Regions:
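Hydrophobic alpha-helical targeting segments used for export or membrane insertion
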Residues: 8-11
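Positively charged n-region of N-terminal signal peptides that target proteins for export
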Residues: 1-4
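Acidic, surface-exposed loops and disordered segments
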Residues: 17-205
Length: 205
């Protein structure tokens, strides 16, 4: 519970940040609720709008505030921003290729195994490296929410050719490749998917 509270408090602070680059979407800082409700998994990007390396650095810096097991910080990011690397990664995301072909940035998200969920090299409970995946998810959550706060859009893709990505970015064997995240500006306004009712997911005792 403490980790969740810290996570939410940090995200509220992050979404009050403005990237200061003059983007029309960043003219005013959105509220935390606006960030949550406007975030969508975007599958069509505006090819005329680009994102700078400096903006990506600002975005990824926010992920460093994410909580992790014993502050292990197991998540790593590999950023494709050059035309050559973007084209290569597009061929490694299966059926999502056409959906993200106009995204100006593609980010590979990994985590170091044997960190979260371990103490002095020993697994602390039955979840094991599942804690690394959990912490990676928290970090990616910070990424996509900070992206929305900056006026950007994202899509987390689980379909990816891990072996090819590992070779392309020289990712160590000690890291598990979790996802590829596209980053850009939505080309059209996406629909809001139906959500379960609160009573379907919450039980009070």
């Amino acid at each position: 519970m403490k980790k969740i509270v810290v996570c939410l408090m940090a995200l509220m602070a992050l979404t009050g940040c403005n990237n200061g680059n003059g983007n029309e979407n960043a003219s005013s800082s959105p509220s935390f609720d606006e960030v949550l409700t406007s975030r969508r998994s975007v599958r069509s990007y505006d090819a005329t709008k680009k994102i700078s390396e400096a903006e990506v650095r600002t975005l990824l810096k926010a992920t460093q505030e994410a909580p992790s097991w014993a502050n292990q910080q197991p998540t790593k990011y590999y950023v494709a921003i050059s035309p050559e690397k973007l084209a290569a990664v597009q061929d490694m995301v299966g059926g999502n290729k056409e959906r993200i072909k106009d995204a100006p940035v593609l980010i590979v998200s990994t985590f170091e195994r044997g960190k979260s969920g371990f103490f002095q090299g020993n697994q602390t409970n039955e979840v094991g490296d599942g804690w690394g995946a959990y912490d990676n998810g928290l970090s990616n959550c910070y990424l996509i929410l900070q992206a929305r706060a900056m006026g950007f859009d994202t899509l987390i893709m689980g379909m990816r050719e891990a072996d090819k990505l590992r070779e392309l970015f020289a990712i160590p064997e000690s890291e598990t490749i979790m996802a590829v995240i596209s980053l850009g500006y939505r080309a059209e306004e996406p629909n809001r998917p139906e959500r379960k009712s609160l009573d379907d997911i919450v039980k009070f005792f």
